[in-house]
Regions:
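Zinc-dependent deaminase
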Residues: 45-112
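Ser/Thr-centric signal marking residues that sit
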Residues: 14, 42, 47
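Short hydrophobic alpha-helix segments
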Residues: 1-4
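Immediate flanking context of iron-sulfur cluster ligation sites
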Residues: 31-43
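Short connector loops at helix/strand junctions that flank enzyme active sites
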Residues: 16, 34-36, 56-58
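Non-catalytic, surface-exposed connector residues within folded enzymatic/regulatory domains
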Residues: 11, 15, 33, 71-73, ...
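Conserved catalytic cysteine-centered active-site region
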Residues: 28
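A short, polar/charged loop-to-alpha-helix boundary motif
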Residues: 6-20, 24
């Protein structure tokens, strides 16, 4: 499944790329449990997305750029390390970090 951030176009604060991709994958596979699936994202997931990744039982999470301001995996609350987190995927941070930073700069420039 593929998705991009649609919070503005959908007027939906939950329409982050991760959430949309998880929804699409769950529909395609016919299950809310995505146990054999890996997720690749450009930016470190926020708390909401990290929780959804945990609930979906994603096997591996790869992300390009750290997000010290809003990230919740290696930054901020470090959701997967919390005792209330029932499933933590294998996490691979800073995968393609330079390319991710370029994509993010273009995305936020177009958004402004």
């Amino acid at each position: 499944a593929r998705a991009g951030n649609r919070t503005l176009t959908d007027r939906d604060p939950t329409a982050h790329a991760e959430i949309l991709a998880l929804r699409e994958a769950a529909r395609a596979l016919g299950s809310e449990r995505l146990t054999g699936c890996d997720l690749y994202v450009t930016l470190e997931p926020c708390t909401m997305c990290a929780a959804a990744i945990s609930f979906a039982r994603i096997r591996r999470l790869y992300f390009g750029a750290l997000d010290p301001k809003g990230g919740a995996v290696d930054s901020g609350v470090r959701f997967f390390a919390a005792p209330t987190c029932h499933h933590a995927p294998e996490v691979y941070p800073a995968v393609g970090e330079t390319r991710a930073a370029t994509l993010l700069r273009a995305f936020f420039k177009a958004r402004r």
